[in-house]
C-alpha cells in the first residue's frame, strides 16, 4: 500500500510543484499539506482524546489538534525553505530544541509530558510515507542533494510540536492566572461593599 500509494504520489506531487516554474510554491503548498496531514495520523486522534479525558477537559482535543497542526505546518514550511535554499537543518534543529528545553522551566509538567509525546505521534506513518517522498521529489526536481537537503523533515516534524504544545500550555497558564486575579479583585470589591448593622 505504501509503495503503491503514498510514496509515489508524494514524490510526483513534490516534483510536479518544483518543476512548474514557481518553485517557491513548495513553501505554502507544503505548509497546507502539513497542516491537514495531522488529521490523517491515527495516533493523533487517540492522543488528543486521551489528553482531553486525563485533563478533565482542561486541554481539549481541538486545542491539541490545532497546536499539532500548526507545529507540523511550520516544520514543513521550514523543510521546503531548506530545499530551496540549501540551509543546514542544524540551524533550525539546535535552536528549536534549546527553545523547547527552556520552555520546560516555565510550563506545567503535564504540558511538557504531552508535548514530548506529541512529537513522536506527529512524526508518524503519514510523515514517513508522504511528506518525506514529497520533499525528496521536490529536491530531485530542483537538482538538490537528496541526502542533505530533503532529509531532516521528520526531525523537524518531531521538534515543532514540542514548542507549539508547550506554548499552548504557557498561554493557558497565563489565562488561568489572569482569571484567578480577576476573581480575587472581584471578591475584594464585594467585601468592601458589605455593610454591617449593629
Predicted regions and their residues:
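A cytosolic-side transmembrane-helix exit/cap motif
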Residues: 4-9, 108-120, 170-179
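Helix-loop-helix junctions within the multi-pass membrane cores of secondary transporters/permeases
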Residues: 27-104
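Small-residue-rich segments of transmembrane alpha-helices in multi-pass membrane proteins
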Residues: 62, 67-74, 120-136, 185-193
Amino acid at each position: 500500500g505504501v509503495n503503491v500509494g503514498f510514496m509515489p504520489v508524494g514524490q510526483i506531487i513534490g516534483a510536479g510543484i518544483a518543476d512548474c516554474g514557481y518553485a517557491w510554491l513548495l513553501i505554502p503548498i507544503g505548509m497546507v499539506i502539513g497542516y491537514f496531514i495531522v488529521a490523517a495520523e491515527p495516533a493523533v486522534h487517540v492522543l488528543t482524546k486521551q489528553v482531553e479525558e486525563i485533563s478533565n477537559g482542561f486541554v481539549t482535543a481541538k486545542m491539541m489538534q490545532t497546536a499539532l497542526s500548526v507545529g507540523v505546518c511550520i516544520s514543513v514550511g521550514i523543510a521546503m525553505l531548506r530545499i530551496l535554499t540549501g540551509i543546514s537543518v542544524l540551524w533550525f534543529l539546535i535552536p528549536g530544541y534549546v527553545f523547547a528545553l527552556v520552555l520546560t522551566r516555565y510550563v506545567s509538567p503535564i504540558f511538557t509530558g504531552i508535548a514530548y509525546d506529541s512529537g513522536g505521534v506527529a512524526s508518524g506513518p503519514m510523515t514517513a510515507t508522504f511528506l518525506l517522498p514529497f520533499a525528496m521529489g521536490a529536491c530531485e526536481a530542483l537538482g538538490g542533494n537528496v541526502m542533505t537537503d530533503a532529509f531532516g523533515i521528520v526531525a523537524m516534524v518531531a521538534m515543532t510540536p514540542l514548542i507549539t504544545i508547550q506554548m499552548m500550555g504557557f498561554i493557558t497558564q497565563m489565562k488561568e492566572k489572569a482569571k484567578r486575579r480577576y476573581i480575587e479583585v472581584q471578591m475584594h470589591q464585594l467585601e468592601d461593599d458589605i455593610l454591617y448593622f449593629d
